[in-house]
A protein has these predicted regions:
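Positively charged, aromatic-enriched patches within helix-turn-helix-type DNA-binding elements
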Residues: 146-222
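Short, flexible hinge/linker loops that cap or flank conserved catalytic cores
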Residues: 2-4, 75, 127, 132, ...
Length: 235
């Protein structure tokens, strides 16, 4: 997947493995990557480098991620900022957005989700339309978190939306029930993979009431696959 198009991104992350993995994937996607290992380095790099976008972990040593964001915004740095949160915690999200961040990704995440968020932020920063994922007649707006099938709005619950977004981001790939379960729950909650079967069943009925599109395939013992190909324009 490529989508960086030479854009310069600052990655502020203290976890070595995650930092190096993300950096490698971002470079592979076409980004030029600067890295910082703590909050103080992040502020310095964020002020000194000509950036297009920044990724900031909230749990940083020396200076918390929220303070990094506040200082960059106080210095009138207007490039988009994507925050990484330790878990799907509403308070982290709210505080991050209030500090000046533009979007968030909760751990654990897949790189495809990070890339989609970055591309969305860069499109908006460039004054482009809100980014959409399109697979056949199914259109998912990653910013507004809305879904349409053949231009007709489909009402989804939060959990249904999360499942659909994850499947569409990785259209054509086999996604295990375990992986989908991790997309739904905080790490502290007891996970029930049977819930995934229920949600996928509801998604099928809502997206494909006539059973014509068959957008979500079940692969017994392996998981699920979104069977409709992604449009090139939505990559």
């Amino acid at each position: 997947i490529r989508g960086g198009a030479g854009m310069r991104v600052l990655l502020v992350e203290d976890e070595t493995v995650l930092r190096e993995t993300l950096k490698a994937r971002l470079v592979e996607a076409g980004f030029t990557v600067d890295v910082a290992q703590d909050g103080e380095e992040g502020v310095f790099a964020g002020l000194e480098y000509p950036l297009d976008v920044a990724i900031v972990d909230l749990g940083l040593p020396k200076l918390p991620g929220l303070e990094v964001i506040r200082r960059l915004r106080a210095a009138r740095k207007t490039y988009p900022i994507l925050i990484l949160t330790a878990r799907d915690n509403w308070q982290d999200k709210v505080e991050g957005l209030q500090a000046g961040a533009d979007d968030y990704v909760a751990k654990p995440f897949h790189f495809e989700e990070v890339l989609a968020r970055l591309q969305a932020l860069l499109r908006r920063a460039g004054g482009w339309a809100s980014p959409e994922l399109k697979c056949g007649p199914i259109m998912l707006d990653t910013r507004a978190q809305t879904v349409k099938v053949a231009d007709a709005a489909v009402d989804l619950t939060t959990f249904e939306y999360r499942i659909l977004e994850h499947l569409m981001l990785r259209a054509g790939e086999v996604i295990s029930k375990t992986e989908l379960t991790e997309r739904l729950y905080d790490q502290d909650f007891e996970r029930d993979s049977n819930v995934i079967e229920v949600l996928v069943g509801r998604l099928r009925r809502k997206l494909d009431p006539q059973d014509e599109l068959k957008p979500i395939e079940t692969l017994r013992g392996r998981g699920y696959r979104f069977a409709l190909a992604r449009d090139q324009a939505s990559r």
